[in-house]
Amino acid sequence: MNSIEFPLLDRTTQNSVISTTSNDLSNWSRLSSLWPLLYGTSCCFIEFASLIGSRFDFDRYGLVPRSSPRQADLILTAGTVTMKMAPSLVRLYEQMPEPKYVIAMGACTISGGMFSTDSYSTVRGVDKLIPVDVYLPGCPPKPEAVIDAITKLRKKISREIYEDRIKSQRENRCFTTNHKFQVGRSIHTGNYDRGFLYQPPFTSEIPSETFFKYKSSVSSHELVN
């Protein structure tokens, strides 16, 4: 008669007890299933799109891209943020459930980049609108750098306490700037307001009669030189 053979698992596994805290269990579940909301407005987002391929395979980190902010707990901003897009970004962030995280990817997102030079329509840093957890510099950052930023965010999540994060978000709110616009008269009739037209100071301060008298007294050879 053949003897009864027990499975290998029953023969080798001993009784064991796993102890943990609810906070550690919550952190482990969140860092293992980060669902990012992809907010790409410029060329940096192309580098993040390459992570979806088989070469980098960002699915191993539990990243599942979502198209709705109510189903995401991570927003990854990549590219230039303009003044017109700023309210939409803040609205998307406010619609995300707690706890939520932000990764600022690229120089244009962190500081405005080259597009913020003498520009009135570019936000010089996304941290002026929403709180940022990880800054990822570069123009554009490589996919390996994006993976490193996600790894650092996972380490941050594993060490945090949920109550402390909610308290800090309620106290340390990000600041916003109120822009005031001057409403002018309608210009559809062709009558432009002279106050809105730019006049160089070196010609506007000189009377027209004096300017033309000086121009007629100077020869063409002197004007060229």
Swiss-Prot record:
Signal peptide: none annotated. InterPro entries: NADH_UbQ_OxRdtase-like_20kDa, NADH_UQ_OxRdtase_20Kd_su. It is found in: Plastid, Chloroplast thylakoid membrane. It comes from the Eukaryota. It is an enzyme of class 7 (translocase). It catalyses: a plastoquinone + NADH + (n+1) H(+)(in) = a plastoquinol + NAD(+) + n H(+)(out); a plastoquinone + NADPH + (n+1) H(+)(in) = a plastoquinol + NADP(+) + n H(+)(out). One of its GO terms (molecular function) is quinone binding. Its EC number is 7.1.1.-. [4Fe-4S] cluster binds at C43, C44, C108, C139. Binds 1 [4Fe-4S] cluster. It is a peripheral membrane protein. GO terms for biological process: aerobic respiration; electron transport coupled proton transport; photosynthesis, light reaction. One of its GO terms (cellular component) is chloroplast thylakoid membrane. Keywords: 4Fe-4S, Chloroplast, Iron, Iron-sulfur, Membrane, Metal-binding, NAD, NADP, Plastid, Plastoquinone, Quinone, Thylakoid, Translocase, Transport. Its cofactor is [4Fe-4S] cluster. NCBIfam families: nuoB_fam, PRK06411.1. Belongs to the complex I 20 kDa subunit family. NDH is composed of at least 16 different subunits, 5 of which are encoded in the nucleus. This is NAD(P)H-quinone oxidoreductase subunit K, chloroplastic.
